[in-house]
Amino acid sequence: MGAMSPWHWAIVALVVVILFGSKKLPDAARGLGRSLRIFKSEVKEMQNDNSTPAPTAQQSAPAELPVADTTTAPVTPPAPVQPQPQHTEPKSA
């Protein structure tokens, strides 16, 4: 009941083609393939890094970074805004 039959896959493929168009699908598939290759190579590199022990005897302490000046100039509050007098014209009777 939960398995996808071939008809379900055909309908899904048709909906994808309708939504994205046939011109964008090859580019999307190519980009996905490149991303997967990069991901696999990074995973393999991480596994190789974990298998080779890091040199522990010659670890250097991280260099001390200069501290940036964090003082700020005092901020003066803006002057209060005075309400403008409203000019009303006398109503003619």
Curated annotation (Swiss-Prot):
Chain intervals with Low complexity compositional bias: 51-74
- Where does it localize? Cell membrane
Recite the UniProt keywords alphabetically.
Answer: Cell membrane, Membrane, Protein transport, Translocation, Transmembrane, Transmembrane helix, Transport
A GO CC term?
Answer: TAT protein transport complex
Q: Where is this region: Disordered?
A: 44-93
Note the topology in the membrane.
Single-pass membrane protein
Highest taxon in the source lineage? Bacteria
GO MF annotation terms: protein transmembrane transporter activity
Q: Give TM regions.
A: 1-21
Kindly name one Pfam family recorded for this protein: TatA_B_E
One GO term of the biological process aspect = protein transport by the Tat complex
The record's HAMAP family line, in alphabetical order, gives: TatA_E
Similarity field: Belongs to the TatA/E family.
Q: How does it assemble?
A: The Tat system comprises two distinct complexes: a TatABC complex, containing multiple copies of TatA, TatB and TatC subunits, and a separate TatA complex, containing only TatA subunits. Substrates initially bind to the TatABC complex, which probably triggers association of the separate TatA complex to form the active translocon.
Summarizing the function annotation, the protein's role is: Part of the twin-arginine translocation (Tat) system that transports large folded proteins containing a characteristic twin-arginine motif in their signal peptide across membranes. TatA could form the protein-conducting channel of the Tat system.
Instruction: Provide the protein name.
Output: Sec-independent protein translocase protein TatA
